[in-house]
Each structure stands twice: as structure tokens, then as C-alpha cells.
Amino acid sequence: MAVSMRELNRATLARQMLLRREAVPAADAVRRVVAVQAQEPASPYIALWNRLDGFDPAGLDAAFASAAVVKATSLRITLHAVHAADYADFHQAMQPSLRGSRLLDKRFVPSGLTAAQAEALIGDLLEFASSPRSNAEMEAWLAGRVSGEAKAAWWALRTFSPVRHAPSGGPWTFTPRPLYVAAGIAPSPGDPALSDAALRVLARRYLEGFGPASAADLARFAL
């Protein structure tokens, strides 16, 4: 079936709730649009204000506080807000990119860790992060466990470990000084088969939020 550019445009806008504002709870809206850019604290709030009829920021505050919506490093190796029901699959799907972006980067070298040694730290790291921790606290914890620079180790680990941003105050739930907490899922092994299965879930979710779309569209969205 042929789809005109106008039809494709309108289909995408409708799926993204951008043709008209809708009366939908904040967490449900995040799930419908698949993921919301969250590099800046205000960004998810602006995104939902543009989509929701009568948007109340307190609803998104509550969703972040309860972890119904998770802010974490994910798509395109940047911070996104995603629904809790999607987080585990998205995290696993992105593992090859998240790991490669850090473990193969020269900025990881000063940590003195191998990839396997970094992997071995994740379980204890998540236990330490069972309550919110600052960058300084995480680096201090790592300082006694790595032979090199703790800052380099944490720079890598916070990207591919299942940690989320914990609310840290301010008018948009988060401040420029992030707090990290374990996301409540098991560490994602660097298993290509598991990542491929999760990528299929991500592809279906992408089509729900943006389709019709091509493989190249999905790649631009995720990578």
C-alpha cells in the first residue's frame, strides 16, 4: 500500500499526540510516545505540555518519584524518560551501543579496568546505589575498588549499568547535580542474543509510536 508524504506526516503526528492535545495521565503519555528526550530537566515537561490537555507538572513529578517513568541513559546514548514497562527492554536493546561507547573509548583507559573487571563491579555497585548517590559518592566508592581513576570507571559504568536518575529537587524534579539509584532490574549481560530479542521489542514499540517507518528511521531513533 502506498502512503503519501502527507499521510505519513499526519500518522506520525497523531501517534506522537501532536495533532491535538489529549487528556492522558503523564506516565501513559510517555508510554504512548515511546521515549522523551531528557537531557535537560525541563525537556520532558515541555514535551508533555505540548501534548496533554490540562497538563499538570505535578503528574510527571509523581511519575518520576514513583519510577513509573524512568530517566536514564538509553536511546542515542543520551538521557531519555521512558515508561517503567519499557525500561528493561530498551536498556537491554541498547547494551551493545552503551557498552561500546564507553569500553572502547580512550576515556575509559585511565580506570585501569578491563571490560570483564568493569562487568564484575556492577552487582556490588547496584547494591551501593540502593539509595540515591551523587557522582562524588559513586567515585569515592569505586576509588577503593579500581587500580586507576575512579572518575573514568564511573563515567563508563553509569552509562551501561541499570541505574536511573533519582529525583534531586528543583522545579523539574531533577537538578544539574544528578543523583543515581539502582533501577530495580538485573544487570544486562553483554549477550548479543538477548540484545537482539530486546531490539525486536524496541522496534515494535517504535512503530507503535512513530510508524509507518523504515529500518533507517529506527536506527536514527535509537543510535
Where are these regions (language model features)?
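Long, low-complexity intrinsically disordered regions
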Residues: 1-223
